[in-house]
Each structure stands twice: as C-alpha cells, then as structure tokens.
Amino acid sequence: MKRILLIAVLLGTMITATTYFVCIAAPSVLFGKGIKGSGNIVTRTIDAPDFDRVDAARAVKVVITGKATGKITIEADDNIMEYVVVEAKGGRLTATIDKSVNNVSNADVTVTVPANGRIRALDASSAARITSEVTLTADKFSIDASSAARIDAAVKSTSCTVAASSASNIDAAIETGSCTVGASSASKITLKGSADKCSINMSSAAKLSAAEFTVADCSVDTSSAAKATVNCTGKLRAE
C-alpha cells in the first residue's frame, strides 16, 4: 500500500510540473511572433494568377498598375519577405502577412498587381492600402475599406457599392448608373464623378465629401454626428 501511494504522489508532481511548463510556453504559441522591418528592401516576382477581386490586409500596400506584365511584384523588408502572402483563391487575390506573425512594425510591404480588365471589387482592412493607377471597369463594382484601411481608385460601372467603417478612408472617382454609399465609425469617403441615382447612409461620426460627385436622384440618411455633403441636380431626399 505504501508503494502504491508513493507512485501516486510522484505522478501528481509530474502532472503539475508539465502543466506549469505549458503555461510558460503558451504565449508564443498562441500569440505568434513579432517582427520589426529591417529597412533593407528586396524584390520578388511571381506570375499573376486569374483574379477578379483584390483584398489587402495587415498594412500591406497594393498598387494596381496598367502595365500588362502578367507578373506581380512584391517589395518588402528582407526579414519580412518570407511572411508576405500573395495568393488567389476563388478569384480573390489576397495580399497580407502570414498569420504566424502576430505583430509587424516599421514594415514596408508593397505588392504591384497588373490590371487585368476583370477586377470588380477592392477590399482593404487592418491598415492596408489599395491604390489603382488606372480606371477599373466592371458591370457591378464594390469598394470596401475597414479598420483604418485606405482605398484610392477610379471606377466605371453600371452599379457601384462603396462602404467604409472603423476609421477607414476611401477616395474614389466614380462614373456609374446606380450607387450605394455607406460609412460608419469615423470613416471618411470622398467621391468625384457622377451617378444617375445614389443612396447614402452615414452614421457614427462618419463623413462624406461628394461636392464633386453629381447625382440626379439622391437619398441621404445621416445619424449620430455623421455628415454628408452632396451635389444633387434633381430629386433629393434627406433624413
């Protein structure tokens, strides 16, 4: 009986020690690594896959260029390059930093993408930025920025949706038939161009500057300290 009791006590000690060790190691496993950009920029080139949507996240800058190279150029700090993810799935081209890296500071990551004539949506989040150097054309187009991201683009479409949230910023020149605009949580949208019809919904200290965006038929709904400046040449409904 004494021998059995001794084994039980030792086993209990081993379990306690193992549990303590896991608790110490867990933060690096759960929260990943942090990397500071070296400042030494290197370049990598890959073949451009088929895509019709561009998504950028985690402070990555994406530039859409009119150069028909068929290639995507990635510029990044040499100690961050291996963690830059540029891939296409289901027509969605994503440029971001690998999830294994929890925090990136002083990084400079720019992904240059050729305009392939099929892009119909731009989505930027988490302090990322998308800039189009050419006018993008599609039947239906979507622009969405969130979490301090920024999008600068020119679009021609039959219909267009523009959405900004969480302190993001959109600056767009748009020529469209029908447009839906929405912003919240201190986001800002600046529009130029024209639309036949436009529906606008602004809330929570968001701001729309559209004095240079002429609309024939416009409805505007603002709430919670939001502001909207519009240029309506015909019917205007405001709440």
Q: What are these regions, as identified by a protein language model?
A:
Residues 1-239:
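Intrinsically disordered, low-complexity terminal regions
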